[in-house]
């Protein structure tokens, strides 16, 4: 379905690639993968990268609580013993390029991250620069035993040597396409769509 004019006057086509049931299934699969890779749920902490990564971390925490009894405290969401957020704004490499971003709050889970397996949670993995900023931000907070990355969508086009450990959907895209995730908590619905012709 057409979505009108892009900023450069190019017609943009929009294609839906994931809807609510697909996103739910992807998060359930990621939760099982995380538990399998960690041999259970002990010493695991989720840190969502705001904005939508934080929402996904909360959802993932609830899914883990459904599967793993020791994750029941994660039902409390951000700030619980197992789920937090990690603001990467001041660690981004595009700060001096006129791209304005409002800082978010970093919320470390009550149990901290030292000696834990930290799973960074983000919505869309693209260039890898946000994840690099997250790794930098993590250094100032503590010393986890290991850091893993879970993303809902990996769209390719990496500019840095970064790879996700857990991916909900690999979505090959062209460089002039934009992948957008809407979540009910922030946008009113659960959808992943591709806008074509957006640079």
Each language-model region and where it sits:
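PRPP-associated nucleotide enzymes
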Residues: 1-199
